[in-house]
Amino acid sequence: MQRAVPEGFGRRKLGSDMGNAERAPGSRSFGPVPTLLLLAAALLAVSDALGRPSEEDEELVVPELERAPGHGTTRLRLHAFDQQLDLELRPDSSFLAPGFTLQNVGRKSGSETPLPETDLAHCFYSGTVNGDPSSAAALSLCEGVRGAFYLLGEAYFIQPLPAASERLATAAPGEKPPAPLQFHLLRRNRQGDVGGTCGVVDDEPRPTGKAETEDEDEGTEGEDEGAQWSPQDPALQGVGQPTGTGSIRKKRFVSSHRYVETMLVADQSMAEFHGSGLKHYLLTLFSVAARLYKHPSIRNSVSLVVVKILVIHDEQKGPEVTSNAALTLRNFCNWQKQHNPPSDRDAEHYDTAILFTRQDLCGSQTCDTLGMADVGTVCDPSRSCSVIEDDGLQAAFTTAHELGHVFNMPHDDAKQCASLNGVNQDSHMMASMLSNLDHSQPWSPCSAYMITSFLDNGHGECLMDKPQNPIQLPGDLPGTSYDANRQCQFTFGEDSKHCPDAASTCSTLWCTGTSGGVLVCQTKHFPWADGTSCGEGKWCINGKCVNKTDRKHFDTPFHGSWGMWGPWGDCSRTCGGGVQYTMRECDNPVPKNGGKYCEGKRVRYRSCNLEDCPDNNGKTFREEQCEAHNEFSKASFGSGPAVEWIPKYAGVSPKDRCKLICQAKGIGYFFVLQPKVVDGTPCSPDSTSVCVQGQCVKAGCDRIIDSKKKFDKCGVCGGNGSTCKKISGSVTSAKPGYHDIITIPTGATNIEVKQRNQRGSRNNGSFLAIKAADGTYILNGDYTLSTLEQDIMYKGVVLRYSGSSAALERIRSFSPLKEPLTIQVLTVGNALRPKIKYTYFVKKKKESFNAIPTFSAWVIEEWGECSKSCELGWQRRLVECRDINGQPASECAKEVKPASTRPCADHPCPQWQLGEWSSCSKTCGKGYKKRSLKCLSHDGGVLSHESCDPLKKPKHFIDFCTMAECS
């Protein structure tokens, strides 16, 4: 994220009438933050990244705390700005895990020791002001009253005077704090606009895992193309509406609750600047980011939780932090791994890590960088990390923005967002320059779409486990913990104070500073923190001053519920089996005030337009998609004609089967031309499964998703294998050159031709070749071999070839051939005898043996294997009487029933043959002699020993022999 600061930081001279002071040219106002983001706007009050101008009033007040009996609520009363402000507060620390740990690294003792855990959970409250439902408050009641509240368009920030906080901390609820150290500073301001930039260039699609920097000269973001949907996809209809989203790979289109377990790390600069209040400050920042991720515009159920906090007191014990943002990120990513237990079941295991630093971060050319993150890496333990420059409470927005990048969100003005966001590109959380935040929809349609598709493609499976001991986040508004003076100090340094400006109450925080020795007011164009008092019974919420009394209307969570299923969308294909969708939205009601987002299936899909497509010269649907890119490939590779694209199947990972991977015909280069094939495209040539939104889902041979129907060996969908017969054979001799083995006819299915090379040899000097019906070679012709695995498209059928150098050279095809082809063997040199076997299935004609025509007939199946390989065995086949519908019948004439058994293998079995004894191994004394043992076929051919009966194998083919005694 990058700063965008108007000329002079929006400075103005400090005069007696601050309300009439003129604003610097180029200053902008920031619109109100959504009611649900009551914590977020307060944190934005002191930003130097996405700044806002403001004018404010201030008064000293004495808070009156009272515990409401029996209701678990606390009432806070303030008298200021000629009004009474009554805040009704409830404990709210939902973003903290109960058993979180805080460790201090590198204390002077040199050891890493946990601090004694003080219970911060009881500090944080949220609520309403003066009963106004549009008001909001977020306060901390520890060590005084700190935070912000929002009432009637004005934001209020309250903070104890330095000496008062300790005395106030000793006051019990309902008891007035001791005098005289009881004063708090209460400021109010009006709502304004925010301006800010995040200068990442988003012009091109981004590969997942590329580092993303928030400096426009430095960064490139990345995303997984496989995780994207196409804007033309029917499933995108309604994106930008309140649609329930979120899923994992195993459950397509299912909205599931995600828990982002987080480790917060503060470096030495943070420890020195914030002191003992650091932990509370970090949790306050994170509570705002967590509330942003609860807004329904993100279209997912996401909970940010803290499981661990590390505070580094000795820079030698932590990652190297420099002004180089990219280097700091890399150092931190490498360093944080040592603190992450590998098991996701460990209570301290985290999914992402965030480093906070006061170091001024710089990009390649400027030092306007506020944050940096790796993109699309939320479940990568080595790269799920972010670096945030702490420039005040508005660093909460930087945190939410950088986590958005970790969730694979691009900037809203990126090219891939244009069709989703339209002209509204700068009013959402992922805007490269934030201005006029859309309070009703802080997340853009593109951000919701990108995180949904990212999770839907299985990239968030580590987020499914519920944290065991999350740290409770503060429930009070940040403005109640940090008044305007403190917010100015966070942003502009310890000497800065708040500049009252009634015209910008709640909307923009103005702070003192010097320019050329002149005292001026300056701003970073962010509103006051939520919870800052803006009048009697009022406080700042979302840049507006609102009544505190209506807290229940914006603070009570309302859980979302699914609406009705919508109509089915258009089919993705006009024939051949497409996919269509119906969706439902989480709008009955839409969740609000941090209520739960809908969980469960949000999208249904089904098959459509199942009829066969007209023949397109035998081309498959995937071929057509590859060819569609030919016209975009005018530039050739080197020289020659333009590229012709054909599908690539061989060597493609199963997870990439639904990407459109095409190779240049005749060249071999291959590219991912589209992140997804059209829905309904078969996942592979030998599979009936189809692609749906870039994922392979099961479908039957009838092209219906989730159907159990399969092709039988005959290529018949749902058949029982009785309509075809097996043809098999072998070749064990061949002369040099090309010679035909078998011509496989049209309609043949499940073809397999294989040749196993001799052990230790890459080949035997003989190779398989294929010749098309027109006599042209489609494999290994003209004495040119294809050594690598490849897929050959032949009239719409894919022939899979292992490559000539494989130990088992093999050709396979599963679909029925549309034209015959001839298998040949190419023999070269002094080749060993080939060992080629082939099998395929062809349709057989049904035989009828009825003398008199009847409505039933004897139907036979193929003969089974012979029971013996020699010396007379038996074959069996199934003979059934069936009617004209193929159902079992009993009317067939038994006198003409075909035989169901027959003799086979009536030739003699191979026999063992012993040779003559050899000479004795010794010429004198005792030696040994041996004789050869062969296995011979019935025609005298020598066979391997495995062909003869091992039980009859002679045992005496070596023996002792005794010659004359040696002299």
From Swiss-Prot:
Q: Where is the composition biased (Acidic residues)?
A: 213-226
Give me the residues that bind Ca(2+) 2, please.
261, 344, 465
**What are the annotated GO cellular component locations?**
basement membrane; cytoplasmic vesicle; extracellular matrix; extracellular region
Query: Active site annotated at which positions?
Result: 402
Q: Where in the cell is it found?
A: Secreted, Extracellular space, Extracellular matrix
Q: Which residues form the Peptidase M12B domain?
A: 258-467
Cofactor(s), by name: Zn(2+)
Q: Which SMART domains match?
A: ACR, TSP1
Q: Report residues binding Zn(2+).
A: 198, 401, 405, 411
Which Pfam families does the annotation name?
ADAMTS_CR_2 (PF17771), ADAMTS_CR_3 (PF19236), ADAMTS_spacer1 (PF05986), Pep_M12B_propep (PF01562), Reprolysin (PF01421), TSP1_ADAMTS (PF19030), TSP_1 (PF00090)
The positions flagged as glycosylation sites are 547, 720, 764
Any S-S bridges, and between which cysteines?
A: 333-385, 362-367, 379-462, 417-446, 488-511, 499-521, 506-540, 534-545, 571-608, 575-613, 586-598
Q: Any idea where the TSP type-1 domain is? A: 559-614, 854-905, 908-967
Q: Which UniProt keywords apply?
A: Calcium, Cleavage on pair of basic residues, Disulfide bond, Extracellular matrix, Glycoprotein, Heparin-binding, Hydrolase, Metal-binding, Metalloprotease, Protease, Repeat, Secreted, Signal, Zinc, Zymogen
Entry PTM: The precursor is cleaved by a furin endopeptidase. Glycosylated. Can be O-fucosylated by POFUT2 on a serine or a threonine residue found within the consensus sequence C1-X(2)-(S/T)-C2-G of the TSP type-1 repeat domains where C1 and C2 are the first and second cysteine residue of the repeat, respectively. Fucosylated repeats can then be further glycosylated by the addition of a beta-1,3-glucose residue by the glucosyltransferase, B3GALTL. Fucosylation mediates the efficient secretion of ADAMTS family members.
Q: Which first-to-last residue range defines the signal peptide? A: 1-49
Give residue spans, biased composition: Basic and acidic residues: 203-212
Q: Where is this region: Disordered?
A: 1-27, 192-250
UniProt region (Spacer), positions on chain: 725-849
Any domain commentary? The spacer domain and the TSP type-1 domains are important for a tight interaction with the extracellular matrix.
Role: Metalloprotease which cleaves aggrecan, a cartilage proteoglycan, at the '1938-Glu-|-Leu-1939' site (within the chondroitin sulfate attachment domain), and may be involved in its turnover. Also cleaves COMP. Has angiogenic inhibitor activity. May play a critical role in follicular rupture.
| Protein name, entry field | A disintegrin and metalloproteinase with thrombospondin motifs 1
Organism expressing this protein natively: Homo sapiens (Human)
